Design a protein with these regions (language model features):
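Thr-Gly-centered strand-to-loop micro-motif
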Residues: 7, 20, 73-74, 105-108, ...
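Glycine- and other small-residue-rich loops at beta-strand/loop junctions that grip anionic moieties
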Residues: 22, 29, 47, 84-85, ...
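Structural signature of PLP-dependent enzymes
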Residues: 37-60, 70-79
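Active-site pocket-lining segment
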Residues: 65, 72-82, 95-101
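Conserved core segment of the aminotransferase class I/II
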Residues: 1-44, 48
Length: 164
C-alpha cells in the first residue's frame, strides 16, 4: 500500500490495521480456503482435460446439426471449459429466451448484456449478425456427458424452430 493513500474500510467496526480492517480474521475459513486451493490445484490438469472433452463434444454436436454455425476462436488455444458459437440467422437472445433451464451468455464475456457490439468479437473481424448470434457456454467440474448432450439437443431444437 502506498504511503498516504486513503482507503475506506469495506467493513466498519473495530479499528484493526489503522482502521482499515474490522474484526478478527476467520481462521477456519482461511484454512478451508487453503485446503480448497490445494485440492483444486491437484486435480486441475485432469479436470481441464475432462472439461475440454465435454466442450469438444458439445461443439461437434452443434456443428454437425446446424449448417453455418461458427465457432469463435476454435482454431486457437482457448479455455478448456468454454465454447463460444455463433448461430446463423437467429439472435442468440431469442434462442436463450426459449431455454429458461439453460444458463448461458450472449456475445463475449466483455459484453454479457449483448446490447452493444462486443469489442472482442469485433476485433476478431466478426460482423453484427455474427455477434448477435453468439452464445457462450461453459462446462464445470461436475458437468456430465448427459448434460452436454441435453444442452446440445435443446440448442439445436431451439435454433431449428426459430430458423424456420
Amino acid at each position: 500500500m502506498r504511503r498516504g493513500l486513503a482507503l475506506e474500510s469495506l467493513i466498519h467496526g473495530a479499528g484493526h490495521e489503522n482502521g482499515i480492517r474490522a474484526g478478527t480474521e476467520n481462521t477456519p475459513y482461511i484454512v478451508g480456503l487453503g485446503q480448497a486451493a490445494h485440492l483444486a490445484a491437484n486435480g486441475l490438469d485432469e479436470s481441464a482435460v475432462g472439461m475440454a472433452r465435454l466442450r469438444d463434444r458439445l461443439e461437434k454436436q452443434l456443428c454437425e446439426a446446424i449448417p453455418g454455425l461458427k465457432v469463435n476462436g476454435g482454431s486457437v488455444d482457448r479455455l478448456p471449459n468454454t465454447l463460444s458459437v455463433s448461430f446463423p440467422k437467429v439472435a442468440a437472445r431469442d434462442i436463450l429466451a426459449r431455454l429458461p433451464e439453460l444458463c448461458a451468455s450472449t456475445g463475449s464475456a466483455c459484453h454479457s448484456t449483448g446490447q452493444v457490439e462486443s469489442a472482442t468479437l469485433a476485433a476478431m473481424g466478426k460482423g453484427i449478425d455474427h455477434v448477435a448470434g453468439t452464445i457462450r457456454l461453459s462446462c464445470g467440474w461436475y458437468t456430465s456427458q448427459d448434460e452436454v448432450d441435453r444442452v446440445a439437443g435443446l440448442l439445436i431444437d431451439a435454433w431449428e424452430n426459430l430458423s424456420g
